[in-house]
Every structure is written in structure tokens, then in C-alpha cells.
Regions:
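One-carbon transfer enzymes
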Residues: 1-154
């Protein structure tokens, strides 16, 4: 309801909506979202900070139209979410990190990669500093993918 992305969308006159997932089975939630997306005649679904795994039925129904951003250079640290990924990067001693924008498939974080953005992991970096750097890259990566998508749609 109060997600920053919804506020930003409204600020740019982009139609957006919220569907509460609490106390709903995944399939029920996904059907409700799918219905709303069809009503809005949506062409592209962006998963930004979406901390849920979509059902196979939803992914199949919207195949080729769902894009996710993952806070690592996939396939490294696949399956992790948010700060856990940055902890894994530090624990592994990775020299670089970044983000991956990919098409969503039934297999989590295994869809075709559309864009990867990289940044160095510096001595003294923390989970917080990596999160900040990677989130900046995520925004850049999404813009790049959306612009490319628009060109291909025309």
C-alpha cells in the first residue's frame, strides 16, 4: 500500500495498484493480480522489490512479459533476496557484484539474462554500502531494459 514505487508511479501519472497478499494462498493472490493486469491491458510486468515467488501458472500465463531484478551477478547467489545476497557476496570474498535483470521463468533466478551491471566490492564495504551501490545499478539496468523493450515493441 505504501511502497515507494507506487508513490513514484502516481507522481508520474502511471496507473498502479496494490493487491494485499496477506492471508491468501499464492495461487489466489496470483489469480487476483493476473485479473487486474488483464483489465489494465499490461504488456510488461516489472518485479521491483517483490519478495515473493510467483506460481507456475502465473509465470506461464505471462511468459516473456515478466522481468525481475536480482541483486547479484547471476548465476552467483541465485535464490537469495535483499540483504542476504549482499551478505553472501561479502562472505564469498567476491571482488565485484552488481545486479541482473532477467526474464522470469518457473525456475527461480534462472530466466534469460537481459542486462547485468557491475561494481567493485571494495575493502570496507558493508551490506549497507553494497545494497546502496547495487540499488543504483538496478535503476539504471531497468531503464536500459525498458527502453530496449519499447524499441522492440514498435
Amino acid at each position: 500500500k505504501k511502497a515507494l514505487i507506487l508513490e513514484k508511479a502516481r507522481g508520474h501519472n502511471i496507473d498502479s495498484f496494490f493487491v494485499d497478499h496477506k492471508n491468501k494462498k499464492r495461487e489466489v493472490f496470483d489469480k487476483e493480480i493476473s485479473q487486474r493486469l488483464k483489465e489494465k491491458e499490461v504488456d510488461l510486468i516489472l518485479l521491483i522489490g517483490f519478495m515473493r515467488i510467483l506460481s507456475g501458472g502465473f509465470v506461464s500465463e505471462w511468459s516473456g512479459k515478466i522481468i525481475n531484478v536480482h541483486p547479484s551477478l547471476l548465476p552467483k547467489h541465485a535464490g537469495g533476496m535483499n540483504e542476504d545476497v549482499h551478505k553472501q557476496v561479502l562472505k564469498a570474498g567476491d571482488k565485484e557484484t552488481g545486479c541482473t535483470v532477467h526474464l522470469v521463468t518457473a525456475q527461480v533466478d534462472e530466466g534469460p539474462i537481459l542486462v547485468q551491471k557491475r561494481c567493485p566490492v571494495l575493502e570496507g564495504d558493508t551490506v549497507g554500502s553494497l545494497k546502496e551501490k547495487v540499488q543504483k545499478l538496478e535503476g539504471e539496468a531497468f531503464v536500459e531494459v525498458i527502453r530496449g523493450w519499447e524499441k522492440n515493441e514498435q
